[in-house]
UniProtKB/Swiss-Prot annotation:
Gene behind this protein: ccmE
Lineage per the UniProt record: Bacteria, Pseudomonadati, Pseudomonadota, Betaproteobacteria, Rhodocyclales
Keyword Repressor: no
Entry protein name: Cytochrome c-type biogenesis protein CcmE
Ranges annotated as spanning the membrane: 8-28
Molecular function in Gene Ontology: heme binding; metal ion binding
PANTHER family linked: CYTOCHROME C-TYPE BIOGENESIS PROTEIN CCME HOMOLOG, MITOCHONDRIAL
Record family assignment: Belongs to the CcmE/CycJ family.
Taxonomic source organism: Aromatoleum aromaticum (strain DSM 19018 / LMG 30748 / EbN1) (Azoarcus sp. (strain EbN1))
Function according to Swiss-Prot or TrEMBL: Heme chaperone required for the biogenesis of c-type cytochromes. Transiently binds heme delivered by CcmC and transfers the heme to apo-cytochromes in a process facilitated by CcmF and CcmH.
InterPro entries membership: CcmE, CcmE-like_sf, NA-bd_OB-fold
Keywords, in A-Z order: Cell inner membrane, Cell membrane, Cytochrome c-type biogenesis, Heme, Iron, Membrane, Metal-binding, Signal-anchor, Transmembrane, Transmembrane helix
Its membrane topology: Single-pass type II membrane protein
GO biological processes: cytochrome complex assembly
Annotated Gene Ontology cellular component terms: plasma membrane
Length: 148
């Protein structure tokens, strides 16, 4: 085999390996990518059914219900415009309470019930995840526009 052919074969092999590595990285990234949606977007059907994503907003006052098993909790997340029912099996963060900001990650069932696999509570009086704050602001603006 001539040196030129060897070089060409080596370059082609290196390009093939590089393309394969990039494809594997992109595939892994896509599988771990979790999108954020507001309760309004979820209620309007803009969120994927059966695929993991996050919902952020406020825990609706009076919505927390604990099951007899002591592990399952049901509550609702709202952006003041729409309300999404959430079911979570596990222990909730200490800062989780009604009327406070929260972000839940999980999947939306065909019945519209959000099955959370993770619950994140806001950290202090002044903190709210930027996406959740934006969603609440947008919902309040929309509600004011409708009232006028």
């Amino acid at each position: 085999m001539k040196p030129r052919s060897k070089r060409l074969l080596l370059v082609a092999g290196a390009v093939a390996l590089l393309v394969g590595a990039v494809a594997l990285v992109l595939n892994a990234f896509q599988q771990n990518l979790v999108f954020f949606h507001t309760p309004t977007e979820v209620a309007e059907g803009k969120a994927p059914v059966g695929r993991a994503f996050r919902i952020g907003g406020m825990v609706e006052t009076g919505s927390i219900r604990r099951a007899a098993d002591g592990v399952t909790v049901q509550f609702a997340i709202t952006d003041t415009a729409k309300v999404i029912p959430v079911s979570y099996k596990g222990s909730l963060p200490d800062l989780f309470s009604e009327g406070k900001g929260a972000v839940v990650q999980g999947t939306l069932g065909p019945d519209g019930q959000f099955q959370a696999s993770e619950v994140l509570a806001k950290h202090d009086e002044n903190y709210m995840p930027p996406e959740a704050q934006h969603a609440v602001d947008q919902a309040q603006k929309a509600a004011q526009t409708v009232q006028q």
